[in-house]
Amino acid sequence: DRSPQSLAQDDTTHMKSLYAATRVTLADPLHLILGARYTKWRVDTLTYSMEKNHTTPYAGLVFDINDNWSTYASYTSIFQPQNDRDSSGKYLAPITGNNYELGLKSDWMNSRLTTTLAIFRIEQDNVAQSTGTPIPGSNGETAYKAVDGTVSKGVEFELNGAITDNWQLTFGATRY
């Protein structure tokens, strides 16, 4: 009889990224922001390896209403490796998806006080969901399954203030 292999093993995760972004004035007061991040991710275990390469683009438009107020719309794709495992002990594939945001920003006192109010929608695939059962051969580690079609939407508010040059405060609130 052989006992199940323990998941307490020497796993190694490698991640390398490269990104670039630019902001272009299309016609004052309209600005275009474009960017991309390339990520190379690999996990090596005693029993298998998994590698994923992904480019996550970003695009945004900013319209300056006046010196203090601007409105914006943005899009970015999502690529987020995760550490959860399935019932066979293998790591789940990275979370992928899209993020959409529309907002209003203000800037006061030479940027010593800024605010942001935004609405957002996040669409994700491969999101880990607990199966409620342990992985066979583990020390009770819970198994997860990847779920597609997860959607989050809501509104967020952020307030940033520089009380002094060395003391800055941030307040943020999000409602899903």
State what each model feature region is:
Residues 1-69, 80-88, 172:
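Signature of Gram-negative outer-membrane beta-barrel scaffolds
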Residues 9-15, 48-54, 93-97, 108, ...:
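Transmembrane beta-barrel outer-membrane domains
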Residues 13-21, 54-60, 97-101, 152-158, ...:
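Transmembrane beta-barrel architecture of outer-membrane proteins
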Residues 26, 38, 65, 77, ...:
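Short beta-strand segments enriched in hydrophobic/aromatic residues
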Residues 28-29, 145-176:
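Gram-negative outer-membrane beta-barrel transporters
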Residues 62-106, 111-146:
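Surface-exposed extracellular loop regions of Gram-negative outer-membrane beta-barrel proteins
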